[in-house]
């Protein structure tokens, strides 16, 4: 019996659909297909299939460089690769399912699929010239530079304020300004540190927006307010 032969363009689309289904189940945004990421993924899948190599650095580069070569301007890039082999071949859905299932059963690959900051995806699948049917799948995730977040925090109050973003906390002294750039999404939290006669308390928290300035101001009875405006430098 002849080996099954999958429709590779349909396999690519089904991998995207399955990936987005997993993300939706985790309350994450669905990824949109980006032609440049797809170009990079296909080119690398074909290279791995031809060469017999299987790594993220088989071409001497890395996922970010491959994305840039294809014309993508990344803020963040991640990559999954899979190799599936069977003497019976694969039908279209089976090959897509096997690639995604393998990634989901691997912690680092699963983390890429569930990358909260990713907004775009490109998938490439290629057949190896080996006599036994073997397929290479490459899945690239990206967030373009145009979707990076840059904002400013200014402390005009008379107090030190703790500022926490993406797991890192800094103390903002009076008259201190911080400019933050990030490819990841997350909340920014402002807290008034605990004192000798008072416990620390949260002032406010936001999902920071690109180009915004968050200004801390002294209010009545020691209260601190936050004014949100446009950061002219980030326009």
Regions found by a protein language model. Give the residues of each.
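Beta-strand-rich domain onsets/edges
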Residues: 2, 139-145
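Short, well-ordered surface patches within globular domains
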Residues: 3-68, 115-122, 130
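A well-ordered secondary-structure block
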Residues: 63-140
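Asparagine-centered strand-capping/turn motif at beta-strand->loop junctions
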Residues: 147-160, 218
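Short, surface-exposed beta-strand/strand-loop-strand elements in extracellular ectodomains
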Residues: 158-168
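Intrinsically disordered, low-complexity Pro/Gly/Ser/Thr-rich segments with frequent PxxP/GP/PP motifs
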Residues: 166-185
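A short, solvent-exposed beta-strand micro-motif common in secreted/extracellular proteins
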Residues: 184-198, 202-203
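Extracellular beta-sheet/turn segments enriched in Thr/Pro/Gly and aliphatic residues
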Residues: 199-235
